[in-house]
Amino acid sequence: MCGIVGIVSQSPVNQSIYDALTLLQHRGQDAAGIVTVDDENRFRLRKANGLVSDVFEQVHMLRLQGNAGIGHVRYPTAGSSSVSEAQPFYVNSPYGLTLVHNGNLTNSSELKEKLFRRARRHVNTNSDSELLLNILANHLDHFEKYQLDPQDVFSAVKQTHQDIRGAYACIAMIIGHGMVAFRDPNGIRPLVLGKREENGKTEYMFASESIALDTVGFEFVRDVQPGEAIYVTFEGEMYAQQCADKPTLTPCIFEYVYFARPDSCIDGVSVYAARVHMGQRLGEKIAREWADVDDIDVVIPVPETSNDIALRIARVLNKPYRQGFVKNRYVGRTFIMPGQALRVSSVRRKLNTIASEFKDKNVLLVDDSIVRGTTSEQIVEMARAAGAKKIYFASAAPEIRYPNVYGIDMPTKNELIAYGRDVDEIAKLIGVDKLIFQDLDALTGSVQQENPSIQDFDCSVFTGVYVTGDITPEYLDNIAEQRNDIAKKKREKDATNLEMHNEK
């Protein structure tokens, strides 16, 4: 899962992109990068491992000159954590092209071989984002002309859609031309468009979430539609075209459960409101199914994604709502940390209990989901150590039983605590007295309350049904082998830092 930003302006964009990336930091804390186009049509790039605030110092910001640029925060699901795989990526032909990407391609191996045979293009890393950039570059190269028109750009995106499968929201810049943003035909990963008027001219911005627009003074216009491409010239002219044959909106349900900020709006859905609805429905289920609900003394969220959900549950059950955990905001989100050992060590560094809220009480803990069970088990241990008598646990998402292949680090079914287990077995493993999960129809219904036009979602982690229709058991076995923690460590050890000029 990553966050992406692109701005075409009439004034320097370095600070605006930086500010937008800080607002998308929750989508990835592994690496960050910005590339701008200066007055001499040169790319200015800075990317490195770390948080946005660590990667960009004043000297870097001063060198990132230009009125157009793109940015990225990374959480790796493919490839390694090497800085050589940080984004943006760059190719010098045709024109000079750079790209940022959020998502995951599901036919990377096939594409890499095909690209080399067809175009003699070498992809130097294991990143599917570099591969995607080269696919797009190859299609743009076919026009063999000095100046592209918007239709040429749309044609290249259309051919790219035909080649690649999976989830992808992308923003690319073409030297001497402009910026193009496009979204996969299923709309799995989010992408929004914003604009602002400056000195009588319109400036445009793309971002993974609407919150990134708000803070830098851009007005939300709309979501980029599934399969659509929007092209903005560096002079500020905007063009849009549907580039997929059969687009359909099936957004990832986990965006609303976990990834997106509550103050964002994605595909016509207020993330905050959707989470309140999740709390309403889960609270009603608890009241309906638990005979001992009166024994609950207090409702406590596992911060921060579940705060709004837990507050609504407390109101439905007519129970006190308390903040029993204090979060250290300078530790990354544990679920999206690569490596089980790092996830385990970070939980206790991230959270601390307020003992008075637990001592001698029957506590209902509320979390957005239970993935590996790492966080849940340790949180329960902390609650017991703080003096809780009984611990009930409610998950705002159903049981996660299947791997994700569209950009979330759930690569192996054996890493998922719910795989092959029922609710009682999961409860025993994480150490709670009672456990309840949200029903899938209640979860999807919570989001549809905000936008009834969304007919379906990617719910593959709950159902095992993958919306792209190309996922086989062999593919799942392959990514399990490639993406387990041992394989990740080996790639990081072998990684070589080969990249274009980086503003040190």
UniProtKB/Swiss-Prot annotation:
| Catalytic residues identified in the record | 2 (nucleophile)
* Catalytic reaction list: 5-phospho-beta-D-ribosylamine + L-glutamate + diphosphate = 5-phospho-alpha-D-ribose 1-diphosphate + L-glutamine + H2O
Q: InterPro entries in the record, alphabetically? A: GATase_2_dom, Ntn_hydrolases_N, PRibTrfase_dom, PRTase-like, PurF, PurF_N
Cofactor binding description: Binds 1 Mg(2+) ion per subunit.
Q: Name one Pfam family in it.
A: Pribosyltran
Q: What does the record give as EC number? A: 2.4.2.14
The record's keywords, sorted A to Z, are: Glutamine amidotransferase, Glycosyltransferase, Magnesium, Metal-binding, Purine biosynthesis, Transferase
Q: Report residues binding Mg(2+).
A: 305, 367-368
Q: Name one GO biological process term.
A: 'de novo' IMP biosynthetic process
The record's top EC class is transferase
Domain Glutamine amidotransferase type-2 residue range list? 2-235
Q: In which pathway does it act?
A: Purine metabolism; IMP biosynthesis via de novo pathway; N(1)-(5-phospho-D-ribosyl)glycinamide from 5-phospho-alpha-D-ribose 1-diphosphate: step 1/2
Q: Name the cofactor(s).
A: Mg(2+)
Taxonomy, superkingdom: Bacteria
Molecular function terms in GO for this entry? amidophosphoribosyltransferase activity; magnesium ion binding
Provide the family line. In the C-terminal section; belongs to the purine/pyrimidine phosphoribosyltransferase family.
Could you tell me what this protein does? Catalyzes the formation of phosphoribosylamine from phosphoribosylpyrophosphate (PRPP) and glutamine.
Which HAMAP family does the entry link to?
Answer: PurF (MF_01931)
Q: Would you tell me the protein name for this molecule?
A: Amidophosphoribosyltransferase
